[in-house]
Regions:
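Positively charged n-region of N-terminal signal peptides that target proteins for export
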Residues: 1-5
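Sec/Tat signal peptide C-region and signal peptidase I cleavage site
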Residues: 14-20
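Extracytoplasmic small-molecule ligand-binding "clamshell" domains
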Residues: 21-95
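Periplasmic-binding protein-like
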Residues: 38, 113-121, 128-165, 168-184, 187-194
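Solvent-exposed loop/turn segments at secondary-structure junctions
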Residues: 39-42, 78-79, 97-101, 125-127, ...
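Soluble non-cytosolic domains of exported or imported proteins
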Residues: 49-57, 75-78, 154-162, 171-175
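A conserved helix-loop-strand patch within extracytoplasmic ligand-binding domains
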Residues: 68, 72, 78, 96-102, ...
């Protein structure tokens, strides 16, 4: 009987509602932890010692709109989404396509831009067999549908989702997103977006 008051005090901590919202954690830290690879110009890359690119500037704008500072964390492809899923990073800004598979694992912002699908290879990747190159050049290249790029974050954070959407909407509405797209991508960011 003497432990009953203590147990009653612990019950709220065991409740699923006791889970802290991501936006509260971000506000408490005063920073938005943004994971990226920093190796894919013009999206995000290092110019000397300076991190720059379309998504770097977008991340800074989003953090400013959330009234926190942007903390960019350079990581690799293997850790990028895993780190967001585990809570190591708040978001990933690394030209991530909004796919059904990823929608099962993450919540996403609305798309911030669209890009045409491209054949990309890493600088240090071994050359592909000539047969592949010939196959790609023999036929007329086909252009696939544009790919929506969006910002993934941990599922189950509706307050953060709303805050991120509001920040992105303000950046889109006042023309800053369009200016970034023109500067870095030579394209309109929101031309075909809903």
């Amino acid at each position: 009987m003497r432990f009953l008051p203590g147990l009653i005090c612990l019950l709220p901590l065991l409740s699923p509602l006791a889970h802290a919202e991501l936006i509260d954690d971000i506000n408490d830290r005063g920073e938005l932890r943004i994971a990226l690879e920093a190796n894919t110009p013009p999206f995000n890359f290092k110019d000397g010692d300076t991190l720059t690119g379309f998504e770097v500037e977008l991340g800074q704008l989003l953090a400013n709109e959330l009234d926190v500072r942007a903390d960019f964390i350079i990581t690799d492809e293997a850790d990028l989404l895993q780190g967001v899923e585990s809570g190591k990073y708040d978001v990933a800004l690394n030209h991530i396509a909004l796919t059904p598979e990823l929608k099962d694992r993450f919540d996403f912002s609305e798309p911030y831009t669209q890009v045409n699908a491209q054949l990309l290879a890493k600088k240090d990747e071994q050359p592909r067999p000539l047969v592949l190159v010939q196959t790609l050049t023999e036929e007329k290249p086909k252009v696939g549908p544009p790919v929506d790029l969006a910002i993934p974050f941990q599922k189950g954070n509706p307050a953060f989702h709303a805050s991120l959407e509001n920040a992105l909407q303000r950046i889109r509405t006042d023309g800053r997103l369009e200016a970034l797209s023109q500067k870095w991508l030579n394209a309109q960011a929101t031309e075909n977006l809903k």
